[in-house]
Design a protein with these regions (language model features):
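Alpha-helix N-cap/helix-start positions at coil->helix boundaries
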Residues: 32-37, 78
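Extended amphipathic alpha-helical scaffold segments
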Residues: 1-30, 38-41
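Long internal repeat-built scaffold domains in very large eukaryotic proteins
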Residues: 1, 46-384
Length: 384
């Protein structure tokens, strides 16, 4: 439904740049990132149809550039940014932008807020394992197949901060800060927790899980919710606590950003955006739970996506990628529509035979049968 509505809007705007400007003016401050993201996508797709005049394209690009890239209220939504950047780059490629146009502002990073806040156990427990919490914090499909893959290329190090620290370095840094204000009781609880966890390798963790959970509970009680949340995010062996996709498990290699922290942040952010079991639980439960069909989307899934797009934008702006990882890879994985492509299906159902080539069924190569020795000779030819 959402994709169909987006492309229907592309069709409406394809020859109406003035309507695109009017719609943007009316809805640009709407407090719903899901709507504004697709409005920008539709405007971008409409421009890409190539039917706007040079002046029309310029004024639309200028408006979005001023509101999204030159504004102090730049949206922390990685897809909204991507569509808007595409629109300005398209206008630039068409030669409609003046020489003094600040097109450099469209290039990331954009300076969103960092770091994300620590999320306490008390806050997660207050959600009572509702749909959002199960889906994100407790190894649900969204966490494992969407969230983890969207953020697992990022390290724990800020941009321009020098070499990426190891997980062991981060734990030591946290401990040094902890020692400044920790009481003897806090330090004793921390030592007891480390003693239990040092016995737990990846293979024995689940065997020792009851002892580890008991030591964690004692440490949490001793240090309080906020310090325990900081320890969980910055110093714990977080990858042992769930089924994380593509996680780096070595403490002496460049530290990956804590995926458990990312999951918890998305969970809280989705609730902060407005989702609740009381308001939306019954409706969401009535929607078929199938990640491969998209006829109607659960409201909770909408808020999860908004939170994830915000997290990805903030990580892209502020963190170094892990060695060998590509910063552009994240946005490629998250793109979910090509707003310029209006064809929904073709005549080809997989069974029909077409006499003439078309743009979706290219001509078949005419390969004449040849003897085996001729084929082998052809393999060694260096020319077409």
């Amino acid at each position: 439904v959402r994709d169909t509505a987006t492309k229907a809007l592309v069709v409406l705007l394809a020859s109406r740049p003035e309507l695109a400007s009017a719609l943007w003016l009316r809805f640009k401050n709407l407090d719903d990132a899901y709507v504004t993201e697709r409005l920008v996508a539709a405007i971008y797709g409409a421009a890409m149809q190539g039917r706007w005049s040079a002046n029309g394209l310029f004024f639309v690009a200028k408006d979005l550039h001023a509101d999204l890239f030159a504004s102090v209220d730049f949206p922390a939504n990685i897809l909204t940014r991507d569509h808007a950047r595409g629109l300005v780059r398209y206008a630039e490629s068409q030669g409609v932008l003046p020489e003094d146009f600040d097109s450099y502002l469209i290039n990331p990073p954009y300076g969103s807020a960092w770091p994300i806040e620590h999320i306490t156990e008390e806050k997660i427990e207050s959600y009572e394992r509702d749909e959002i919490t199960r889906s994100t914090v407790f190894d649900g499909d969204f966490a494992r197949y969407q969230l983890d893959y969207a953020v697992n290329d990022w390290s724990a190090a800020a941009k321009l901060s020098g070499p990426i620290p190891t997980a062991r370095d981060l734990a030591q840094r946290w401990f040094d800060t902890f020692c400044i204000t920790a009481s003897p009781e806090m330090l004793a609880a921390h030592r007891a927790l480390l003693a239990v966890m040092s016995e737990a390798s990846n293979d024995s963790y689940w065997t020792l899980r009851p002892l580890i959970d008991k030591a964690k509970a004692a440490f949490r009680a001793a240090v309080g919710e906020q310090v325990f949340a900081q320890w969980s995010a910055e110093a714990s062996n977080w990858y042992q606590t769930g089924m994380f996709q593509g996680a780096v498990h070595l403490r002496d290699e460049p530290a990956q950003f804590n995926l458990a922290w990312a999951r918890r942040w998305v969970c809280k952010r989705a609730h902060d955006l407005g989702w609740s079991e009381a308001l939306h639980g019954d409706f969401d439960a009535s929607i078929r739970n199938d990640r491969h069909t998209h006829a109607v989307e659960r409201i909770g899934k909408k808020y999860q996506w908004i939170a994830l797009y915000e997290l990805c934008a903030r990580m892209t702006d502020n963190l170094q990628p892990l060695p060998g990882r590509d910063e552009a890879g994240d946005i490629m994985r998250l793109r979910n529509i090509d707003p310029s492509l209006l064809v929904t299906q073709t005549e080809d159902d997989g069974w029909r035979r077409f006499e003439e080539a078309s743009f979706w069924v290219p001509p078949e190569p005419d390969l004449k049968p040849v003897a085996a020795d001729q084929a082998l000779d052809w393999l060694n030819v260096n020319q077409d």
